[in-house]
């Protein structure tokens, strides 16, 4: 392609809207253009990158035995209501674009396709002889992000590969899940990216287990905790660990102490001259479900630990039967002046045994607190906790003898850097930032049971299909590659997904020898399958060099002064290494470089 004929506009300054390097560079280099909040046009260079990523994904999915299809983007609300996710996606998380057609039928623009593919399977799969089956598509998805940011990282529409597998049982599902894990590793390796596969929370998708594939980058929105031995890695939302041991308590008997103005752990410990590890703090949460009912949760954990609200949400979803709720719409920490309280709450001084009488009778609010406690608090003896009176704490408290142990003992703490690993206490958790590129789930029968998707087994008995789902953000992967690989001059594309392999620059368009040599190389390289740009614009040489660095093409060939000796300059973008090479050696040299770069 000739740059003089391409839609190609670069910017010298960073756009004000862009926050992270990859977003700035993709805008500056003319890869994308903002059309609206979280909505971007993929320009010619970007589209070539996306096509290459898609092809790698397609090849690996096909190699793993998956079959490509294409599902509708507009989805009937009825399918989502059958699965119980319509309210979650349109109200709780609110990420689905919902609309009505001219016949007042409710529809949604697909953020994901579990319901649609399950409905297709329900209609078409009858027998175990048709299984296992794995279907995938590469398609634009839509999500109504409240605060779109970071360009293609968190947009309102994006390109995604999503696959859905159907099996006869869990053992069969795990075989496909393992194949998808390996396929995702291959996709990221072939794309030239450094990554980690980590244990993850399943979120609104659900299922019994999942893993995320994180491209490592400082600007990543996710925190990954891992051990140096390579045996553990997890998203902080899912991570488990062993915290440091609690310090022995200096309190030997139960006693109330005045602790004025100590509504934080730091103030309390300063007042009582104790360690946060000797404190049991209790946080009061309000959980609102899809049926409008509110459940009040008292959450107790060790004073030096923090609540992992993703883990807490999962626990509260399981407890939703108490109020006949299926999905959690909102989860907030209770504040003073709540309408449901029958009397002022002793916020900052709450104990795990706060009386249910604090809850005013109401049709919308469950009349009893649900009480959860983290194991870190269960292990404490002679601890400090609130006294349910403002300005008062209890010291020397023990479970069961002085205060009832909450019914639900769960893991609801946030694992932290420096914590000991569960699998080996000698290993401590390290941290890295990551960009989630892929997520694979073992769904089980969640959707097949909800939508009535069954098959007949060998014994002639009807059974629910056992499902898995597997997503890769194609457009997100492309931007993540930039976030992981750039320098002060611009983008440094991995060779496998670069829009072009090489760019030929004519420093002086008025020099017929330079033009002739460039034209000849351009024809030879493209004919040999080396995707090559020709910068034949009437711009100064300096502008051409800056643009070449900015757009990040792996190899730059300059038909400059060394032509007199029969040479051209070849520059590797990643290292800026430059050397002179004979004209007739450009093609074999580039072939060698590309083969090596793509194979590693």
Curated annotation (Swiss-Prot):
It is found in: Cytoplasm. It holds the Pfam family tRNA_edit. It is an enzyme of class 6 (ligase). Its EC number is 6.1.1.15. Keywords: Aminoacyl-tRNA synthetase, ATP-binding, Cytoplasm, Ligase, Nucleotide-binding, Protein biosynthesis. The keyword Membrane does not apply. It catalyses: tRNA(Pro) + L-proline + ATP = L-prolyl-tRNA(Pro) + AMP + diphosphate. GO terms for molecular function: aminoacyl-tRNA deacylase activity; ATP binding; proline-tRNA ligase activity. Gene3D superfamilies: Anticodon-binding domain, Bira Bifunctional Protein, Domain 2. SUPFAM superfamilies: Class II aaRS ABD-related, Class II aaRS and biotin synthetases, YbaK/ProRS associated domain. Catalyzes the attachment of proline to tRNA(Pro) in a two-step reaction: proline is first activated by ATP to form Pro-AMP and then transferred to the acceptor end of tRNA(Pro). As ProRS can inadvertently accommodate and process non-cognate amino acids such as alanine and cysteine, to avoid such errors it has two additional distinct editing activities against alanine. One activity is designated as 'pretransfer' editing and involves the tRNA(Pro)-independent hydrolysis of activated Ala-AMP. Consists of three domains: the N-terminal catalytic domain, the editing domain and the C-terminal anticodon-binding domain. This is Proline--tRNA ligase.
